[in-house]
Amino acid sequence: MQSYGNPDVTYGWWVGNSVVTNKSSRFIGSHVAHTGLICFAAGANTLWELARYNPDIPMGHQGMVSIPHLASIGIGFDPTGTVFDGTSIAFIGVFHLICSMVYAGAGLLHSLIFSEDTQNSSGLFADDRPEHRQAARYKLEWDNPDNQTFILGHHLIFFGVACIWFVEWARIHGIYDPAIGAVRQVEYNLNLTNIWNHQFDFLAIDSLEDVMGGHAFLAFVEITGGAFHIATKQTGEYTEFKGKNILSAEAVLSWSLAGIGWMAIIAAFWCATNTTVYPEAWYGETLALKFGISPYWIDTADMTGVVSGHTSRAWLANVHYYLGFFFIQGHLWHAIRALGFDFKKVTDAISNLDGARVTLTD
């Protein structure tokens, strides 16, 4: 938290981050509880969409998002993989609700029972077990590059494992291929030339093999990078060029917002135009980009009979774009604060405009 050199800052109740300042276990608890909220929302929304799903109306015209995502990865089809009948969708929804309760319990444990700081971790009992010493390694030292790179490495490995899971799911179970209108097994194409070239035309990708190849490559890069960050430490003097006096909780927050904002904007463009990753059968027809006060996408198909007034693709693309835009604004706000700029000086200057005087002398 930016304090502008004042060690005795009192934050308002609305500054939620202040509650977990320098309390790594509480910080973990807030993350786990947040995961529980997301998991609950996903499960509840899935069951709500399933309850109102009408097989006589195209799925993309019913304003859904959870079920289309599940259908895209081959969940909810009959044994032939050609007819979507909602099979196993209810299980996915209920499973998410159960997981949300587990996450909530873990969040409460970290918030109410476990030590506030993992550096002082002692679990439920005051003994020095090996797992407690291991937990202490995840203490938060915001201006310590060795601590931050150690934690970053674990995040990267988790992302890499998720990519492997997705690639193996497509290879063994299969995902929906709009080219044939059915679920099929997809072998990843680990052609590095294709992967490199798709950096510039990823919106036009029309091969599921290339999509899986990109995820396989990402898995390798992320796991390798994660191992590197866990194993290495700061080399040489820790200078301002490397982040000294800049690396902080607020700086890390700003970078996180930049990353999620950038991903949301990319997802918006991809969703609006690509029909391989976002099949028309589940999301509706592709969109047209328009410009008003800001960019936005509109439906190109006949909206007669569309349940929510817009296709799933339209609201999904637009919501992602605007959320991404505001995430980027949050990134700029927190990045500037992390650099030491005091926004209170701006409000003070504006409030003193009436009393400002300029004296001209010869």
Curated annotation (Swiss-Prot):
Main location: membrane
NCBIfam families with a match to the protein in the record: PS_antenn_a_b
Function of the molecule: The antenna complex functions as a light receptor, it captures and delivers excitation energy to photosystems II and I. The Prochlorales pcb genes are not related to higher plant LHCs.
A Pfam match: PSII
Protein name: Divinyl chlorophyll a/b light-harvesting protein PcbF
Transmembrane stretches, start-end: 27-47, 89-109, 150-170, 211-231, 251-271, 316-336
Subcellular location: Cellular thylakoid membrane
Protein family membership: Belongs to the PsbB/PsbC family. IsiA/Pcb subfamily.
Gene Ontology cellular-component annotations: photosystem I; photosystem II; plasma membrane-derived thylakoid membrane
GO molecular function, a single term: chlorophyll binding
Miscellaneous comment as given in the Swiss-Prot or TrEMBL entry: This low-light-adapted strain contains 7 pcb genes.
Organism: Prochlorococcus marinus (strain NATL2A)
Self-association state and partner proteins as the record states: The antenna complex consists of divinyl chlorophylls (a and b) and divinyl chlorophyll a/b binding proteins and binds more divinyl chlorophyll b than does the antenna complex from high-light-adapted Prochlorococcus.
Topology relative to the membrane: Multi-pass membrane protein
Cofactor(s) needed by this chain: divinyl chlorophyll a; divinyl chlorophyll b
Origin: domain of life: Bacteria
Alphabetically ordered keywords of this record: Chlorophyll, Chromophore, Membrane, Photosynthesis, Photosystem I, Photosystem II, Thylakoid, Transmembrane, Transmembrane helix
GO BP terms: photosynthetic electron transport chain
